Each structure stands twice: as structure tokens, then as C-alpha cells.
Amino acid sequence: MNGLLALAFAAGMLAPVNPCGFALLPAWITAALGDSDASPLPVRLTRALRSGAALTLGFAGTLAAAGLIVSAGARALIQAAPWLGLATGILLLLLGAVMLTGRTPSLRLHLTTSTRRSAGPPTARRMAAFGVGYAAASLSCTFGVLLAVIAQAQATASFAGLLAVFAAYAAGSAAVLLLVAVTTAAAGAALTRKITALARHGTRITAAVLVLTGAYLAWYWYPAATGGATTAAPGGGLATFSATATAWIQAHTTAIAVTAVVVVLAVAAAAIRHRTRQPARHSTPTGTAPSAAAADDCCAPLPVPTPASTDRDSDGHCC
């Protein structure tokens, strides 16, 4: 069983870097870097953990649900993967094209961050929706490995063991996505001071990334959706980079897992330390206000006696 969990964990780590949906990672990173909020680093890292966890929930949850459905007999879902990938690409392409004109469509699936202060960081709901789209685009490339893991789990384990396999698969995806999220947040905090001039162009930069991402996904999935083979050759640029990333992750699975755990614990400790310092900072001015006032009172100059007061005796009569 331990070997099966390790296999599921490794498969989950490889899932986010598949060639079918790998182009969505730059869009997500661009959205995270687009947040120009000048918050302290612990706050930014905490937000990155939340967005990465939400993205993992949408991504791994969608793939796990699809795996359960297909393992139950609904194998027609895998045949719809090319259409899902094509639809995701067209949606991103249209959204980016509209944003290039200067407009911001009010859709439920917000894949961008506005440069306005009121927009704030991406919400967990938006990141989870992004993860669902990421999984839909990655369905065909990642489903073979997931089904192989599910088949072994069904043959060797109970239903509780099957749930443990899915949990290990989700943990593997979380290890990669959380590291990407935290690294992006840390880089964003450092880069914000250097590339502030690009902030006013953030929406158009994000739109350009969405257009390129959508165009790639549509180009990749159109032949498969219409009955042909995918046009992305194994030696293509993005496919080659994805294969290189996959090979590197396979060779460093344990190191990535340990690093992810250390990073999550470090960010959690930094967030707790930041929260414990905030009440002390807010209580300092109120606690020192009375002493400051007392210092002002004790050091206030004495009233200067007037001539009228010096010309009167103790009975109040004039001398």
C-alpha cells in the first residue's frame, strides 16, 4: 500500500506540468504577479498559500472526480477531453482579446487581476475555478496515469484505500503548485519595487498571456476534437519544456516533497508571528497616550502673575 501511495503522490506531482495544460501556468503566475498590493511579505505568502491551495483543490478535485466517474463506467468523459481543452482555449483567447481592447469582462471565471487597488488579490473561489479549467485542459494528458493508479488501487485496496490514493494524488499536485505559488509571491514582493512602471500595463500584459495561452490550447486540441491527432509534436518547444520539467520532477520527487512541507510550515510560522505582532503595534499608541499627556502637563509653563493679582493683599483689598 505504501508503494501505491508513493506512486499516486508522484503522479500528482507530474500532473500540473503536463503538455496539454502547461500553458495555463504562465497565465496563473501572471495573475499572481499582477497583484501590486504593497502588503508585508508574510501577508503575501499567506495569500499565496491560500490561492495555491484553492488552485490545487480545483485541479486535483476535478481530476479525482473524473477518475471516479470513469472508473465507475462513464468512459465517455475521456472522449470529451479534446472538446474541453478546445473550449478552454477559445474562452481564454476571447477573454484576452476583449481585454486587449481595454475592457474587463465581468465573468464568473476571473483569470486576471486588476491594477486597481479595489480589485485586491485573486479570491479562493476564482483560483478554484481556474483549477477546474486547468484540469479540463489537462484531462487527456494526465488521465492515463491517473487511471493506471486507480486501477491498481481498486485491485489491491478497499474504498478507504482508494480515497487515500486520491489524497496522495492531491498532495502531490499541492506540493508543486504551492511551491510555485509561494515562489511567485516572494518574487512578486521583490519585483514590485523594481517594475512599478509596468503596473499600469498589467492588464494588457495579462491579456497578451491569455491570448497566447488560449491560442496554444486551441491549436493543440482542434485536430483531436475534429477527429485528427494533436498537432503539438513531441519535439515542440512547449512540449519539450514540459517533458524536461517532468523528468526533473521524477528525479527529485522526495526533495520537492520535503521542500514543500518546509515552505508551508515556514510560511505558517511567519504568518502567525506577523499576526501576533499586529495587536502589540496597535495597542502601543493607546498605552503611551496618557503618559505623554502627563509629561506635557508636568512640563507646562506656570501662569505669569498679572499686575492686578500682585497689587491685592490676602483679603482681596488693594494695597
Curated annotation (Swiss-Prot):
Highest rank taxon of the organism: Bacteria
Keywords, sorted A to Z: Mercuric resistance, Mercury, Metal-binding
Residues reported in the UniProt entry to bind Hg(2+): 298-299, 318-319
One of the protein's GO biological processes: response to mercury ion
Coiled-coil ranges (or none): none
Molecular-function annotations in GO: metal ion binding
InterPro entries linked to this entry: Cytochrome_c-biogenesis_DsbD (IPR051790)
Name the record gives this protein: Mercury resistance probable Hg transport protein
Species annotation: Streptomyces lividans
